[in-house]
């Protein structure tokens, strides 16, 4: 009997599943295929032994990287050693990736199997995984997979500012396309403007200069001595400017209308702008090549080096190529044609555009191309894998190529490669130290600026926080100053006031309108407007010793006076009662008279 266990890697953790014991694994194939889509049947065949969840997304990313690289992570090792049986010979572990299976078999000693029934079982586990693990939903599993996928891709697609070879690939491709377009458009301008001024084609050879002159001259009959200075500025040659002026006076070209001249000038301006953009793009390419591949640029030139990188796909791919591949890079058609026809294979590809092969004699072109390809391969590897790329090695390699050329021509023996590389190493260390010193200086300046900025922000925030409570205190003090002390109403017993309480000012009674009186509750209004009873006046001869009592008495007098002057508002029921009593009195008087 064989104990079959299956390892399933998920974004949320590792799952170890066990299958029912069978004599042969192949007997499980039809049962598994039938039960993959049915959860109930699948549970009868497969059961979950253990589930090891990842503690965080960072741990999940580490485990995913380990599985992709074929390395047994500590979490996976702990799971397998804990939950697999101790008798390793009877255990068969099914895995989805052969690399991780080989690593488990080598490190832990378990027999691993991939493919066949294992693939079908993993398909079913992947389909029903959220049902096998308690507490895991399909939505949470999908979110975990999405997050891990983004993190894994982010680590794979690394962005390094110093090795932006993709920008070089796009720049050289655009530069080649611009060269073709400018050449085509310039020929169109020459043909179009040649009907009006055919002599200008023979005088001016440069396409960009010809387009500028066509835009400036326009109608040749309007060209005179006043424009000679501007012609000299455009052509940068006084003799050519004088020849253009003389040719315009005796030209054999046809007359042209104003609308045709407008179209020619417009098209010429477009060609001029394209040529200017081409120059700026070339400057940009040179700066990028000096940052990314300085040694290759110093050896073979920026344009040829960029074409090699573009053809290889990246600087890393170019560094991985052998020198024989670099030699014929760009001549694949000729190579396969030669292999098909059993003819001579090409000696050089893109490196033919370098100056070295053109300077070599015909019999030495193959030798120098092979030597140059060897040095290009070395330079690309130095640029790709050095921490601080410098142009020192490229310059030394260029000197070696020059010495080899002179050796082919004159027989002068070049220096040994060992001596040249020792010298280059010393200079490269000095250059790297200088570059690191500059970088550290820039970093210190940046940190100093950042520190100043943070200090300014902290100072501003502290000022704001200190000014805020002061403003709050001011705003809280202002209403206290404005607020007047209102006298409190004291309950009266038998119409007598408490003599211990004094009022600084009498409380003004609120005047009510008729509508408010009608809408308010009569009982409340009656209760609120209670008339104080009159007090017995003190004898004239009596003096008051206590000042507080005297103040209280004066206050109570004012209050009684105020209550007499103010009309007492009564409710509608009291008013109705008074009117009815008056009517009764009148009726009683009339009955007595009768």
From Swiss-Prot:
Cross-link (Glycyl lysine isopeptide (Lys-Gly) (interchain with G-Cter in SUMO2)): 87, 230, 240, 540, 564
Predominant cellular place of this UniProt entry's protein: nucleus
Record protein name field: Nucleolar protein 56
Modification Phosphoserine, positions: 314, 466-467, 511, 519-520, 537, 563, 569-570, 579, 581
Quaternary context: Part of a large pre-ribosomal ribonucleoprotein (RNP) complex, that consists of at least 62 ribosomal proteins, 45 nonribosomal proteins and both pre-rRNA and mature rRNA species. Within this complex directly interacts with TCOF1 in an RNA-independent manner. Core component of box C/D small nucleolar ribonucleoprotein (snoRNP) particles; the core proteins SNU13, NOP56, NOP58 and FBL or FBLL1 assemble stepwise onto the snoRNA. Interacts with NOP1 and NOP58. Interacts with NUFIP1, RUVBL1 and RUVBL2; RUVBL1:RUVBL2 seem to bridge the association of NOP56 with NUFIP1.
Subcellular location: Nucleus, Nucleolus; Cytoplasm; Nucleus, Nucleoplasm
PROSITE patterns in alphabetical order: NOP
Gene3D superfamilies: 1.10.287.4070, Nop domain
InterPro entries according to UniProt: Nop56/Nop58, NOP58/56_N, Nop_C, Nop_dom, Nop_dom_sf, NOSIC
Pfam family, one: NOP5NT
Biased composition (Basic residues): 580-594
SMART domains documented for this protein: NOSIC
